[in-house]
Amino acid sequence: MQLRAGVHRLLFVFTVAAVVGVSSERMFWYWASAPVDHLVVAMVYAPAVAGCLWFVDRYRARGLWGLVLVAPLLGYFVEGVVTPVVYAGGPVPFFPVWFAAWHGMLGLGILLFGLRHLLLARRTAALWGLSIGLGVFWGVWSTTMWLPENVNDPELIADAGAPLTLLGPADFALYAASFTAILAGCHWLLGRIWLTEFVPSRATVWIWIALTGAAVIGWSVAIPWAAPMFVAGVALQQWGLRRHARHGRPSLLAELDGRVAAPALLPLVAIPLAAAAVYALAWELEPAEGLVRYGAMYGVIALQTVVGAVLLVRSFLSVRHVAPPPELGHDRARDVHADPRPLDAGAHRATGAGAAGARPVA
């Protein structure tokens, strides 16, 4: 039974990582992005995603502000552990804020929890609207691939193993449709393997912490501020999440349990249609290089960074006066080692019979 629960948990993490990878990698650029390669992306993202899911469950992250408090962690776990990109701007936290918006809010917030909320609530009109918005964003951002500094980037060329080529409108439409199909398939599967709680074993947690720490220390050899920046960033988010956990209500994992019928996924077809339409229009209009650079690329980065910073500040303000629920008590809520969930939590733990999977929604 424990083996079955472990496999279930791994499949859940892998599928969530595949969803997040669509935004974090496939929307970000389209080079070296064959659908079969997405398996590798999911495996690379899986440890970071597992860490975020653990934080969501442990600190009962729920609602917009709880999600915003978790969002920067995905950026730190991916771009500060797997790669050192988050430290590239020096101790100034520009990249952490931007990645909180791109990795965290776009990946975890919109593609995972946002779409799932709308799918389970059967809010078809909102789902169509969000899908169109995502498609327009994808199409606009993909025009930045045309910039010389991107298409001629030595690191990207080395990763691809060959000179980079621009996708024409037809090829881009196929590309967007392929990864939207993966996104839709993952949401259908998540409805059948969803876990209402994510509680890894103590050994798994310590292994994860050890590997994460080793990676950050490794980056610190060349980047002295890497370890202090990583520890400070994660500790700050954990502080906010600990206060957020005092609301005593179920986490997003518990709230978003349920199956998604295949026909309900139809509105997602608007994502590749809108993306392809915007990309094809830009291809025909041939906008000036400066417009693409300062409008599409720097404009999107600036907007995401500002929005990310505002949301982060607002999320910390939202937890200033959260009182601990009666069942926890003030002492337990302040105990750094205590699991902040209610004492009787665990009816749906991903161990034993509690890992039975998703609960159908009528």
What are these regions (language model features)?
Residues 61-69, 81-169:
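Membrane-interface helix-loop-helix junctions at boundaries between adjacent transmembrane segments
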Residues 212-344, 348-362:
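Extended, charged low-complexity segments
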Residues 1-58:
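N-terminal signal-anchor module of multipass membrane proteins
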Residues 33-87, 96:
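Membrane helical hairpin/interfacial module
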Residues 42-53, 101-116, 174-192, 229-240, ...:
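Hydrophobic cores of alpha-helical transmembrane segments in multi-pass inner/ER membrane proteins
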Residues 9-23, 74, 131-137, 206-213, ...:
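Alpha-helical transmembrane segments
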Residues 7-14, 59-71, 124-132, 198-206, ...:
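Membrane-interfacial loop-to-transmembrane alpha-helix junctions, especially the N-terminal start
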Residues 16-30, 80-87, 139-149, 210-221, ...:
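Membrane-embedded alpha-helical segments in integral membrane proteins
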